[in-house]
Amino acid sequence: VGITVEGANILTRSLIIFGQGAVRCHPWVLKEMNAAKNPDHQQGVRDFDAALFGHIGFTISNAVRSFFAAITLSRIIKAPIKGPTMRYFEHINRFSASFAFAADVAMLSLGGYLKKKESLSARLADVLSSMYLASMVLKHYENQGRPPADLPLVEYGCRLLLYQAQEQLHSFLRNFPIRWLAGLMRVLIFPRGLTYS
C-alpha cells in the first residue's frame, strides 16, 4: 500500500513497518489499547494497570538483557544452533533486546508524539528490517544444508546487516528528543561503544 501511494517509502518505513509492527507484535501494547477503550471503566482500569506494569517489566528485562549482551559481546546469549553462524544468531538476539528496549522507551516517553517524529520511527523500522533480513540470510543458509561455498556470502550479509542495525540504532539515539533518556539508553545499549565496523 505504501509503495503504491507514495514513492519515497517514508510512510512504509515509519508507520507501517514500525508503527503497526510495534502494536501487533508487542506483548503488552495491544492489551493496553484494548483496556483503554473498554466500556466497563473499572475493568478497563484494572486491565490497563496490569498491562502497563507488564510493559514496564518487559522494558526493564530488555534493558538488562541488552546491557549484559553488549558488555559480553553477545556471549551470554544462547544460540539456537552450533556452527559457523552461531555468533550471528547471538548478535541478532542482542540487537533484538536493544531494539525492544529502545522502542518501548520511545513509546512510553513520547507516546503519540512518536508518530510525528517520523525520522525516529523510521530508524527503528530500519533496525527491525536489518534484523529481519539477517535472520532470513541465516534461515536460508540452514535450510539449504549449510553449503560451505555460501558461508562467505552469509558472513558478509550478516556483518553488513548487523552494522546497519547498529548504525540506525545509534542514529536513533543521537536524534532522540529527550537527551538525558537518550544518554541512559546509550549506556545500556552501547556500553562498549559501537562494536561493529
Pin down the residues of each PLM region.
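Flavin-dependent oxidoreductase catalytic core characteristic
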Residues: 1-197
